[in-house]
Curated annotation (Swiss-Prot):
It comes from Drosophila melanogaster. It is found in: Nucleus. Involved in the determination of cell fates in the dorsal mesoderm. Residues 27-66, 144-178, 314-382 are annotated as: Disordered. This is Homeobox protein bagpipe. Is expressed in a segmented pattern in visceral muscle and in a subset of cardiac muscles. Loss of activity results in segmental gaps in midgut visceral muscle. It comes from the Eukaryota. GO terms for molecular function: DNA binding; DNA-binding transcription factor activity, RNA polymerase II-specific; RNA polymerase II cis-regulatory region sequence-specific DNA binding; sequence-specific DNA binding. GO terms for biological process: cell differentiation; mesoderm development; mesodermal cell fate commitment; positive regulation of transcription by RNA polymerase II; regulation of transcription by RNA polymerase II; visceral muscle development. Pfam families: Homeodomain. Residues 48-62 have a biased composition (Basic and acidic residues). GO terms for cellular component: nucleus.
Amino acid sequence: MLNMESAGVSAAMAGLSKSLTTPFSINDILTRSNPETRRMSSVDSEPEPEKLKPSSDRERSISKSPPLCCRDLGLYKLTQPKEIQPSARQPSNYLQYYAAAMDNNNHHHQATGTSNSSAADYMQRKLAYFGSTLAAPLDMRRCTSNDSDCDSPPPLSSSPSESPLSHDGSGLSRKKRSRAAFSHAQVFELERRFAQQRYLSGPERSEMAKSLRLTETQVKIWFQNRRYKTKRKQIQQHEAALLGASKRVPVQVLVREDGSTTYAHMAAPGAGHGLDPALINIYRHQLQLAYGGLPLPQMQMPFPYFYPQHKVPQPIPPPTQSSSFVTASSASSSPVPIPIPGAVRPQRTPCPSPNGQMMSVESGAESVHSAAEDVDENVEID
């Protein structure tokens, strides 16, 4: 007989331990993401009426009389072994555990002789935060054995109207203004008026708003945005122009449109070429020495940089028959053939020079190369 009673007590304690499981166990944490497993575990954790056999007066009072905290809130239905909806099984287990834990405290108060009304009021005040519906989510971090953790209400309430987050969301949605959508005709009229007048007075703004069926605030904001857009576009164009000017390099055109070629030394003296005049004069002097002292076309003064105005050298006249020797100065300025006894003298044909003077050009005959000190001459054979 004692063995039967001990077996019944152990079975009842096992059933109570299964029904009083907390959501902080390893199985609940691992199966939190799987609703099917959680549903099966909640079904398994429900106590069967055969297993819950009270073995003492305290357990008999628990099974017969509903707890005081659940009597007014309608939570006594959770202790009955009838079918519960799947959506409400998980919160019912939490509330069942919480109600059973507080019921033990109530029996402790009865044994010590304290009043049950204060405990019932305390439980009603504690459970009022969770609402009367079972489908409301609960924050079990606040439902521990320590009563000080349950002083503040849970973050989620049963009804959306009572939630502070819903009030904040409605406030944010109320503050957010919808963006006005203008039609093509309204935009065209606004652009036309902006091209005529960038700033509108109060009467002009109200008149235009009435004609376009807009508010004065919309017209004012549109003009402000349009002025800002125009200013930003002008700044971007100015920056692009500065970047283009910094990358621009002066380049001389060497080939004209008609196909003729022009060079820096052939340009007019007053033409704006962007180069240093001293460099141009040095370049002209080198070209003149390369051409044998001949004056370059379109150049009135051969070396205005090296000589003053009254000492500009003139082209050397053609040599005569009596000249048999060449001075060092004439040899350095222009090449003149040196006559050699017994050699055939080449024929010379006079030709006009650009400045109106006569110059001689060698043609026909054969010239002989003669080596002298510090003098080199070129021999041309036709």
